[in-house]
Regions:
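A short, N-terminal "cap"/entry segment at the start of jelly-roll beta-barrel domains
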Residues: 1-39, 101-146
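Ligand-binding loop in jelly-roll beta-barrel domains
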Residues: 28, 90-114, 195-217
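The feature marks the first
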Residues: 28-32, 39-73
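Glycine- and acidic-residue-biased ligand/ion/polar-headgroup-sensing regions
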Residues: 51, 60-75, 156, 165-181, ...
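Fold-core signature of tandem repeat domains
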Residues: 55, 80, 86, 154, ...
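Short acidic-glycine-tyrosine-enriched beta hairpin
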Residues: 75-93, 180-199
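Surface-exposed interaction/gating patches
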Residues: 130-175, 180
C-alpha cells in the first residue's frame, strides 16, 4: 500500500475529513496519513483505540514514536494521558490497550537503529522556550543525528520569515490554525514539506503543532 509515500513530494491531509478505517484488531481504527508497505510499514497514522480495545504484543522493527492526542493510552510500562510523547527504539516490543479510549499520532519505522534511547515525556509539564523568531516558542522533545522533534507554538498574528526546509519537515496541528501560501490548516491537519521546499507560515489566531524534521535524510 502506498499513501503519500514519495518523500520528495509535498503532502497534506486534513484528518477530521477522513473516515476511520478498521485495523485487523477489533476496536482499533486508523486514519492513514502516509504509508509505504503492507500491514508492517513505514507509516504515519492517527490511531483510535475504542474503550477496552487491545493490540497484541508486537516488535518495533523500525522503531515507534507516538504522541497521545486524546484519552489515555496504556502498555506494560504504564499509562500515558493526552500530551504524552513516547519513543520505543528499534527492536523493542510491547502490547497496547486503552481502558477509556484514546487517539494517538504514531510514526513507525522512521528511527535510526543507532538511536537506542527510550523517551517518555509529559509535554504539558515542559516549559516553552524561545524559538527561532519573535512570536515563536518551542518545546524540544528529541534530537538524534539529523532528526529533531519538538512542539512549536506560534503566537497570534505572527508571520515566520520565508525559509527553506533543507532536510524536509512534517507537522501536525494540535490546536489553533496554521496557514501558508498553499492553504490553511486547522486542528488535526498534517503536512509534509519535502527537502528543498520553501514556504512562509503564519497564524492569525495562534497555533500549536508537532514538528519532526531531518528524518528524510
Amino acid at each position: 500500500m502506498k499513501i503519500n509515500a514519495d518523500l520528495t513530494k509535498r503532502a497534506e491531509v486534513h484528518t477530521p475529513d477522513m473516515e476511520w478505517v478498521p485495523s485487523p484488531e477489533p476496536g482499533v481504527l486508523r486514519r492513514m496519513l502516509d504509508r509505504d508497505g503492507g500491514e508492517v510499514a513505514r507509516s504515519t497514522t492517527v490511531v483510535r483505540f475504542e474503550p477496552g480495545a487491545r493490540f497484541p504484543e508486537h516488535t518495533h522493527g523500525g522503531g515507534e514514536e507516538f504522541l497521545v492526542l486524546d484519552g489515555v493510552f496504556s502498555d506494560e510500562d504504564g499509562d500515558y494521558p493526552a500530551g504524552t510523547y513516547v519513543r520505543h527504539p528499534v527492536g523493542t516490543s510491547h502490547s497496547a490497550w486503552s481502558d477509556e479510549g484514546c487517539e494517538i499520532l504514531v510514526k513507525l519505522m522512521q528511527m535510526d537503529p543507532a538511536d537506542s534511547k527510550k523517551v517518555v515525556l509529559d509535554t504539558d509539564a515542559l516549559d516553552w522556550q524561545p524559538g527561532p523568531e519573535a512570536g515563536v516558542d518551542i518545546k524540544p522533545l528529541h534530537e538524534f543525528g539529523d532528526e529533531k522533534v519538538m512542539l512549536m507554538r506560534i503566537l497570534p498574528g505572527t508571520r515566520i520569515a520565508r525559509h527553506r526546509h533543507e532536510a524536509g519537515t512534517e507537522l501536525f496541528v494540535l490546536d489553533g490554525t496554521l496557514a501558508d501560501e498553499d492553504g490553511t490548516y486547522g486542528k488535526g491537519a498534517w503536512q509534509r514539506q519535502p527537502a528543498g521546499s520553501v514556504h512562509e507560515p503564519f497564524s492569525e489566531q495562534g497555533c500549536v503543532f508537532y514538528v519532526k524534521k531531518g528524518h528524510f535524510v
